[in-house]
Amino acid sequence: MPELNKDIRWQQRFANFRKALAQLKKFVDKGELTELEEQGAIQAFEYTYELAWLVLKDFLEYQGQTDIYGSRDAIQKAFQAGIIEDGEKWMDAYVSRTKTSHTYNEETAREVVDAVMNDYYPLFIDLNRKMETLLDR
């Protein structure tokens, strides 16, 4: 794949990430959520998380990395490259994303929503800022 296409790919993915982040922000800004809104917040988290790790993967591949096979690899390599800072919280987000895709349990849902509001949303905001600076290069 030519360099130009790889460049466009991560930038296009980043644009989609920003749209997902804007949707997630609506839930975060609302604060107290009904059960139905919690389900919507979880879905918004899932979309945002998926796009976040794919942005990391595409950007790292643009930088020459080739051995990224999933979100865990992308997170680890992005942490090593200094793109993301809190590797532990990113791995917590990975675990939460796995939980939301394999089971629905009201208690788990509330735990995930709490983590999204307090931990993961700030991670996504930080990633957005970092990628904006890289976009401007």
Where are these regions (language model features)?
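Solvent-exposed interaction patches of small proteins and small membrane subunits
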Residues: 1-137
